[in-house]
């Protein structure tokens, strides 16, 4: 039995199964267009042709949101002028809900929500997205550092729905720490203990002191 709200997505999946394209399509909604989000969108635009020809990956940015409004096109947005599109949408918009905006992807196959904010409001919609079969990739640390039960629920929902909940950049300044630990566990290793200086600031200070830089100069 297929829920009515999942009918369109199901038809898209069946269509792809019977009429396979040579390219895999990934539909992406980027929330946050500050330093991180803007760089991500620029990289996607620059690498679009390379990903398509070398990886057979058609990466469509179908949605972009800032703190005030969002733009959405299921066929893919033009990234060269997305800031102007956001301004135009902001001028004519009558209210804005990031949850409603992101859930427009619910009927798109292979849909991914990318959170480049530090917003508690945005992180609060992850569960709804995962329940609607939308993967979540986040640089926002709030959800993964929230109550443990909520964190486990997010991971379990992603597993049950066959989608991804990824947060690699939450720790280690973007180093592949979480992925490495997962690979070790998946290959049968048992993690007994992890020792680390978890503060990036302290790591910087220690490195400077080790290079004989005076403490007073290091923290200046």
List where the protein language model places each region.
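Short acidic, glycine/serine/threonine-rich loops at helix termini
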Residues: 2, 39-43, 72-79, 148-151, ...
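Rossmann-fold NAD(P)-binding glycine/threonine-rich loop
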Residues: 119-132, 141-184
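Short, ordered loop/turn segments at secondary-structure junctions
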Residues: 33, 66-69, 141-144, 170-172, ...
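Conserved anion/nucleotide-ligand pocket segment
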Residues: 180-220
């Amino acid at each position: 039995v297929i829920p009515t709200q999942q009918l369109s997505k199901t038809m898209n999946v069946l269509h792809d199964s019977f009429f396979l394209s040579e390219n895999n399509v990934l539909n992406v909604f980027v929330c946050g267009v500050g330093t991180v989000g803007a760089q991500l969108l620029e990289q996607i635009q620059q690498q679009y042709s390379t990903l398509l020809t070398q990886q057979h990956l058609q990466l469509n940015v179908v949605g972009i949101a800032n703190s005030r409004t969002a733009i959405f096109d299921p066929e893919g947005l033009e990234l060269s002028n997305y800031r102007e599109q956001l301004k135009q949408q902001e001028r004519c918009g009558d209210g804005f809900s990031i949850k409603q905006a992101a859930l427009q992807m619910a009927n798109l196959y292979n849909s991914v929500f990318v959170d480049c904010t530090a917003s508690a409001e945005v992180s609060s919609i992850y569960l709804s997205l995962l329940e609607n079969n939308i993967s979540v990739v986040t640089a926002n640390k709030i959800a993964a550092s929230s109550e443990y039960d909520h964190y486990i629920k997010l991971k379990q929902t992603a597993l049950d729905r066959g989608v991804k909940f990824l947060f690699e950049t939450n720790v280690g300044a973007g180093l592949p720490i979480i992925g490495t630990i997962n690979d070790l566990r998946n290959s049968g290793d048992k993690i007994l203990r992890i020792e680390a200086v978890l503060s990036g600031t302290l790591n910087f200070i220690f490195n400077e002191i080790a290079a004989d830089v005076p403490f007073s100069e290091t923290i200046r």
